[in-house]
Amino acid sequence: MEQNEFGLVEKIVYLNRVAKVVKGGRRFSFSALVVVGDAKGAVGFGLGKAQEVPEALRKATERAKKDMVQIPLVDGTLPYEILGEFGAGCVMLKPASKGTGIIAGGAVRAVMEAVGVTDVLAKAIGTNNPHNVLRATMAGLTSLRSAEYVSQLRGMKLEAPRK
């Protein structure tokens, strides 16, 4: 895990070279998909496009930092099982007991490491397109609600508060 000077974890999920065919030949550009998190519950992702790789990465990282969201975590895992969907991508995320580790692949693993989840079971269903899998993962994570928040919505008191 790469940590920058602000203590943020940056992960490159996908780097793609695309070609535009013009009269003189092919013109290449790059797109980068990056996940940024603080490993304490905040995570964001960004897509950057440019003529050069470093510029695409910079743009993606900037966008990811700008769009960070807070995710409720319970002892290094998720509070409950969740299903995130985006396009054809569907990601199932299950909380796991301590010591399990991150059992996930590709884009899902990058997001989990950036957000600070240490134990989780995940399965990407439907597509293996990194863009859709990443957005499905983020959709699932952003729909998570903490026990405190739900009890406040219902106007009830928690018997045993959870961390």
UniProtKB/Swiss-Prot annotation:
Pfam families: Ribosomal_S5 (PF00333), Ribosomal_S5_C (PF03719). GO terms for biological process: translation. One of its GO terms (molecular function) is rRNA binding. One of its GO terms (cellular component) is small ribosomal subunit. The keyword NAD does not apply. Residues 8-71 form the S5 DRBM domain. Keywords: Ribonucleoprotein, Ribosomal protein, RNA-binding, rRNA-binding. The N-terminal domain interacts with the head of the 30S subunit; the C-terminal domain interacts with the body and contacts protein S4. The interaction surface between S4 and S5 is involved in control of translational fidelity. Part of the 30S ribosomal subunit. Contacts proteins S4 and S8. With S4 and S12 plays an important role in translational accuracy. Located at the back of the 30S subunit body where it stabilizes the conformation of the head with respect to the body. HAMAP family: Ribosomal_uS5_B. Belongs to the universal ribosomal protein uS5 family. This is Small ribosomal subunit protein uS5. It comes from Nitratidesulfovibrio vulgaris (strain DSM 19637 / Miyazaki F) (Desulfovibrio vulgaris).
